[in-house]
Amino acid sequence: KADICSRLYAVQEAVETFPYSRQMIAGVHIEGPSISSKDGPRGAHPKEHIRSPSIKEFESWQEAACGLVAMITIAPELHGAIDYLREIATRGVIVALGHSDASEEDIHKAADAGAQLSTHLGNGLAGTLPRHPNAVWAQLAEDRLSASLILDGHHLPKSTAQVMIRAKGIERVILVSDSVKFAGMEPGRYTSSIGGDIKVSCDQRVSISGTQFLAGSGVSLLDVV
């Protein structure tokens, strides 16, 4: 918990100190820590840091960041998640759904409570989903949810991304790189606080070594879009 606050304070200090930072940082997106603990949905996030949502903790984030926390990604199926996201939505923070094993009902309840976005739609899910219904179909069909898509050439096949953009409409889609600190690094094995033992392949695929799970991206959108 202290680590998140210390990093938020560093961002806030940069915004106050450096003009370029002030112009470039519109807000902070906190992806977790209230996400699914299951392998697959949690992605590369360390299981030991996953915890239940807490308004008190959210308030400590905003205090450290001087109000810069603009978006939070949460798994809506967690105990207390709907009440939590309803409250932070009333405070002007964008609520996004992600790294989740949510049911169709969970997703609709979250939208009712004020959720506005699907984080990395099509990723941060179980490796195998029912044909239908499933969380992807439910989020595509939910008109109150916009979608962010990782278009690094690895997280989503081109055809899948095309269908998702057509379903949501270009005005409700945000393209992201999901680039991490290994972007542009030579192929090889690295160590990270997120994911642990990381492999960077020749095509800049960043994954947890020995698994199919991705651990961010090794490219920028300019490289692939």
Stretches with model-predicted labels:
Residues 3-133:
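Histidine/acidic-residue-rich, glycine-tolerant segments that coordinate divalent metal ions
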Residues 1-2, 74, 147-152:
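Conserved strand-turn element in the central/C-terminal portion of the radical SAM core barrel
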Residues 106-225:
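Active-site-adjacent C-terminal substructures of enzyme catalytic domains
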